[in-house]
From Swiss-Prot:
Catalytic activity: (2S)-2-hydroxy-3-oxobutyl phosphate + 5-amino-6-(D-ribitylamino)uracil = 6,7-dimethyl-8-(1-D-ribityl)lumazine + phosphate + 2 H2O + H(+)
Residues given in the record as (2S)-2-hydroxy-3-oxobutyl phosphate binding sites: 85-86, 127
Listed name of the protein: 6,7-dimethyl-8-ribityllumazine synthase
Pathway: Cofactor biosynthesis; riboflavin biosynthesis; riboflavin from 2-hydroxy-3-oxobutyl phosphate and 5-amino-6-(D-ribitylamino)uracil: step 1/2
EC number, as in UniProt: 2.5.1.78
Functional description taken from the UniProt entry: Catalyzes the formation of 6,7-dimethyl-8-ribityllumazine by condensation of 5-amino-6-(D-ribitylamino)uracil with 3,4-dihydroxy-2-butanone 4-phosphate. This is the penultimate step in the biosynthesis of riboflavin.
Presence of keyword Cell cycle: no
Keyword field contains RNA-binding: no
Cellular component aspect of the GO annotation: cytosol; riboflavin synthase complex
UniProt-listed GO biological process terms: riboflavin biosynthetic process
Gene3D superfamilies: Lumazine/riboflavin synthase
Alphabetized InterPro entries for the sequence: LS, LS/RS, LS/RS_sf
Length: 153
């Protein structure tokens, strides 16, 4: 039996981050986490591009454009959607999730879901580097691993 898996060596790979500006004070912490993960695993700063979009809903389109460019081993999507008093949260979360998954499937480039979806601001803060780790860091790690796995198949 042959086991296929990726490693966490990011050297000589280029990655893109797409970040939603809405709730920027949280998203900036997610970006910091992603950059930390990339740096710790050998990705040079010059091999990371960051694209800002207005909010989470706009992330899939830019992620698709970046993935289709052929320049990147992976694309990390970072944003924050916090539940409010209306059903808007449910629509945004559902469509962004589907959009990001479809981009990855359509382009065969790892497009990683690093969107923090929470019930309240406290939960979002926890997932941006306090109690619950940093989901940006986790997303960058997944991008590195998936990029290497795809190379091994």
């Amino acid at each position: 039996m042959r086991i296929l898996e990726g490693n966490l060596i990011g050297q000589d790979k280029k990655f893109a981050i797409v970040a939603g500006r809405f709730n920027e004070f949280i998203v900036s912490k997610l970006i910091d986490g992603a950059l930390d993960a990339f740096k710790r695993h050998g990705v040079e700063e010059d091999n990371i591009d960051l694209a800002w979009v207005p909010g989470a809903f706009e992330i899939p389109l830019i992620a698709k454009k970046l993935a289709k460019s052929g320049k990147y081993a992976g694309v990390v999507c970072l944003g924050t959607v916090i539940r409010g008093a209306t059903s808007h949260y449910d629509y945004v979360c559902g469509e962004v999730s589907k959009g990001i998954a479809n981009v990855s499937l359509d382009t065969e480039v790892p497009v990683i879901f690093g969107i923090v979806t929470t019930e309240n601001i406290e939960q979002a803060i926890e997932r941006a580097g306090t109690k619950a780790g940093n989901k940006g860091f986790d997303a960058a790690m997944a991008a590195i691993e998936m990029a290497n796995l795809l190379e091994n198949i």
